[in-house]
């Protein structure tokens, strides 16, 4: 049975069924590699039209020399919902670059409305692999009602193992279909 499931998963991935489960997707743009925020990552935690999306952030896959790269992880407040151009991450980036023009700082805002620490835990691992110079977590508003929270309608989990299993399963194409 495990071999059949593994074979089905591989076949679905090869045939392009489902979507990437990571927060960022590596792509080629002209002659350089970039990382683009995965607009479908919210499908892991929310059904269909209720899925939330990250901002359309794009950055070089390899951080340019001399540039500082900061990441903001969080919910709608971190995102700057409804006016992301006025989020604290955009203001932080502008303030640092205005105050110290010799230091180039980019602030990548990964805020997604309605998520909580179960989701942020997944994203933090991926962001830390990108070796940020600073990681800011602005969260706490959705712990009760967000995915796998005690009052959630999206993937209720009664314990840690159930939540982690559900999050892992959401990366499988067999579950996405």
Where on the chain are the PLM-derived regions?
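Membrane/wall-proximal cationic-aromatic binding patches
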Residues: 15-100
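Hydrophobic membrane-insertion alpha-helices, especially the h-region
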Residues: 1-10
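Solvent-exposed loop/turn segments at secondary-structure junctions
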Residues: 76-79, 112-117, 141-146
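Structural motif
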Residues: 107, 113-124
């Amino acid at each position: 049975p495990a071999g059949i499931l593994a074979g089905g998963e591989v076949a679905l991935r090869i045939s392009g069924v489902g979507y990437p489960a990571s927060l960022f997707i590596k792509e080629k743009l002209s002659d350089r590699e970039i990382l683009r925020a995965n607009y479908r990552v919210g499908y892991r935690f929310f059904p269909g039209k209720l899925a939330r999306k990250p901002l359309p952030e794009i950055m070089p896959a390899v951080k340019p020399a001399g540039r500082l790269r900061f990441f903001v992880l969080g919910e709608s407040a971190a995102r700057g919902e409804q006016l992301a151009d006025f989020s604290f991450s955009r203001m932080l980036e502008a303030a640092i670059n205005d105050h110290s023009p010799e230091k180039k700082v980019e602030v990548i805002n990964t805020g997604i409305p309605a998520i909580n620490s179960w989701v942020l835990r997944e994203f933090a691992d991926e962001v830390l692999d990108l070796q940020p110079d600073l990681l800011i977590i602005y969260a706490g508003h959705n712990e009760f009602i967000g995915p796998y929270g005690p009052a959630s309608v999206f993937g209720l989990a009664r314990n840690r193992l159930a939540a982690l299993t559900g999050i892992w399963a959401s990366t499988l194409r067999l579950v996405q279909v």
